[in-house]
């Protein structure tokens, strides 16, 4: 069983910071993945099965202008259909989604006719169940207003350790507050702190030998808050295991 993580220090009030600074912006939204969102599993953030990792069906693939090479993975956006510009909106509705995937550009199509995710467009290719909360299925694409919001998660931040004896590939999931991660450090009971780098999506890498050592992480969110997850993985951890901490970024 994973040990509880401990709070280290905070340099920003996450929810208040996001709420105070995020202004509504204009964009567009389409949908994919089928009525059960089964086609949205996996994705460029590396979250895998979105049901078991807790993200569910309120998710979206972001255009590259928003995805930011994976730095936006885990962020939450409140999306409202712009009724002033479309008859396909459902009045008085909004949905909060989590960024779990990349909507890649398609340069063979004009950005206003099929190339919805081409830069610099701010576009959300939403899981169909999420999209249908704000838009009528026949519409296909709708104009939206969106803003970044604080993420609410069940339970603590989770760490899935993959790789091999000299290569740690750690997937960080279920991040509350800002939802996204700015930087990560890793430490074994016999090592000092080592800075990790983003490998892809929400996966972070380091080259250490940490076998038979309890593992700690120092994680800084994109809102500037740092938590230390002390010995979150016990010394008998195995590759492929997921460890759940006892704290969140709020």
From Swiss-Prot:
User: Can you give the residue ranges of the Expansin-like EG45 domain?
Assistant: 42-156
**Pfam families in UniProt:** DPBB_1, Expansin_C
Please state which protein family the record places this protein in: Belongs to the expansin family. Expansin A subfamily.
Q: What is this protein called?
A: Expansin-A12
Q: What are the residue boundaries of the Expansin-like CBD domain, all occurrences included?
A: 166-245
SMART domains reported for this sequence: DPBB_1
Tissue expression, per UniProt? Expressed in roots.
- Organism source for this protein? Oryza sativa subsp. japonica
UniProt keyword list: Cell wall, Cell wall biogenesis/degradation, Membrane, Secreted, Signal
- Record's signal peptide: 1-24
Annotated TM spans = none
Identify its membrane topology class: Peripheral membrane protein
Domain of life, per lineage: Eukaryota
> Has keyword Transport?
no
- Its predominant location is secreted
Where does the record place it?
Answer: Secreted, Cell wall; Membrane
**GO annotation terms (biological process):** plant-type cell wall loosening
The function of this protein is:
May cause loosening and extension of plant cell walls by disrupting non-covalent bonding between cellulose microfibrils and matrix glucans. No enzymatic activity has been found. May be required for rapid internodal elongation in deepwater rice during submergence.
Q: Which GO terms describe its cellular component?
A: extracellular region; membrane
Entry keyword annotation includes Secreted: yes
Q: Which InterPro entries match?
A: Expan_Lol_pI (IPR007118), Expansin (IPR002963), Expansin/allergen_DPBB_dom (IPR007112), Expansin_CBD (IPR007117), Expansin_CBD_sf (IPR036749), RlpA-like_DPBB (IPR009009), RlpA-like_sf (IPR036908)
